[in-house]
Amino acid sequence: MYVRHLGLRDFRSWACVDLELHPGRTVFVGPNGYGKTNLIEALWYSTTLGSHRVSADLPLIRVGTDRAVISTIVVNDGRECAVDLEIATGRVNKARLNRSSVRSTRDVVGVLRAVLFAPEDLGLVRGDPADRRRYLDDLAIVRRPAIAAVRAEYERVVRQRTALLKSVPGARYRGDRGVFDTLEVWDSRLAEHGAELVAARIDLVNQLAPEVKKAYQLLAPESRSASIGYRASMDVTGPSEQSDTDRQLLAARLLAALAARRDAELERGVCLVGPHRDDLILRLGDQPAKGFASHGEAWSLAVALRLAAYQLLRVDGGEPVLLLDDVFAELDVMRRRALATAAESAEQVLVTAAVLEDIPAGWDARRVHIDVRADDTGSMSVVLP
């Protein structure tokens, strides 16, 4: 798989650009702040319908405009597929597949399969559980696009149920007991959709675990062994069983946990149980990586998580596109060499670098130089001829 064409209109710093890309390695070169990462971000958005840098879509739209468009042509096994994504302010985003409108933007998920390496990856080890949940969900969606709808529906249920929990004090004051019947309905919906999401995550962690261990050993052979596990908020006594992916059983456990935490939820007005409260546990030896890993170990583990994702996508069928955003500048010589070796088999590698010296020696790559120019509308990124 490779991206043959990338077109942007009013996306971040790019007013208008059309890039013809090729299999093999391409390096986008330019000083920091010139818009290199925005190209990678656009491709990642086409992969997951989300940015790796921000949680909302508004910052993706160029200042002074009301919409951004990302257009890609992806070649997979000799077949071309065109995707256009329109990100708009104040209205629902739209998508087209091979020039035809689709009902939902989720319908284009899976056309482009990519793995992203970025400086933000350090947050997978040292950041909040939300960073690790997003890593799992993004990978699950790339592998099984239907998970995007599962997550979207679960998030809708959590929003509705949270609003209901916040309304309980007023309902009690009015003597309205019907709110508790409604809450039971939303409990069932949370358990149903939450169980499906948890099952997908646990199944994914089971497959990732041996790949993470192998990749970490390659990156840090002198370090302790790496392991991962899934911790569910419904398991008040400890981590969930890693083989437990039965949806009915998971739903029953979620309902039981909701009942057990009902008083606390009513007091605080928030949902305390569900996959939005879960975490991916990372360990080095018998210690949690967060708080105990050195800077080098943390980077090795972060890269190992991405390499493991890359390997799973390869096993699924077809080489995913590798997106490397300034990651070589963050790694020492040994880890840089290990990542470069892993990338050698990829059909397409798209890399950003502030200076060419950040690219591994001996890499044969096309170079695209990025600059910034200004006009009456402000500064914008451009590709130098």
UniProtKB/Swiss-Prot annotation:
<keyword id="KW-0227">DNA damage</keyword>
<keyword id="KW-0235">DNA replication</keyword>
<dbReference type="InterPro" id="IPR018078">
    <property type="entry name" value="DNA-binding_RecF_CS"/>
</dbReference>
<comment type="similarity">
    <text>Belongs to the RecF family.</text>
</comment>
<dbReference type="InterPro" id="IPR027417">
    <property type="entry name" value="P-loop_NTPase"/>
</dbReference>
<dbReference type="GO" id="GO:0006260">
    <property type="term" value="P:DNA replication"/>
</dbReference>
<keyword id="KW-0067">ATP-binding</keyword>
<dbReference type="GO" id="GO:0000731">
    <property type="term" value="P:DNA synthesis involved in DNA repair"/>
</dbReference>
<dbReference type="InterPro" id="IPR001238">
    <property type="entry name" value="DNA-binding_RecF"/>
</dbReference>
<dbReference type="InterPro" id="IPR003395">
    <property type="entry name" value="RecF/RecN/SMC_N"/>
</dbReference>
<keyword id="KW-0234">DNA repair</keyword>
<dbReference type="GO" id="GO:0003697">
    <property type="term" value="F:single-stranded DNA binding"/>
</dbReference>
<dbReference type="GO" id="GO:0005737">
    <property type="term" value="C:cytoplasm"/>
</dbReference>
<dbReference type="InterPro" id="IPR042174">
    <property type="entry name" value="RecF_2"/>
</dbReference>
<dbReference type="GO" id="GO:0005524">
    <property type="term" value="F:ATP binding"/>
</dbReference>
<dbReference type="GO" id="GO:0006302">
    <property type="term" value="P:double-strand break repair"/>
</dbReference>
<keyword id="KW-0238">DNA-binding</keyword>
<dbReference type="Pfam" id="PF02463">
    <property type="entry name" value="SMC_N"/>
</dbReference>
<keyword id="KW-0547">Nucleotide-binding</keyword>
<feature type="binding site">
    <location>
        <begin position="30"/>
        <end position="37"/>
    </location>
    <ligand>
        <name>ATP</name>
    </ligand>
</feature>
<comment type="function">
    <text>The RecF protein is involved in DNA metabolism; it is required for DNA replication and normal SOS inducibility. RecF binds preferentially to single-stranded, linear DNA. It also seems to bind ATP.</text>
</comment>
<dbReference type="GO" id="GO:0009432">
    <property type="term" value="P:SOS response"/>
</dbReference>
<protein>
    <recommendedName>
        <fullName>DNA replication and repair protein RecF</fullName>
    </recommendedName>
</protein>
<keyword id="KW-0963">Cytoplasm</keyword>
<keyword id="KW-0742">SOS response</keyword>
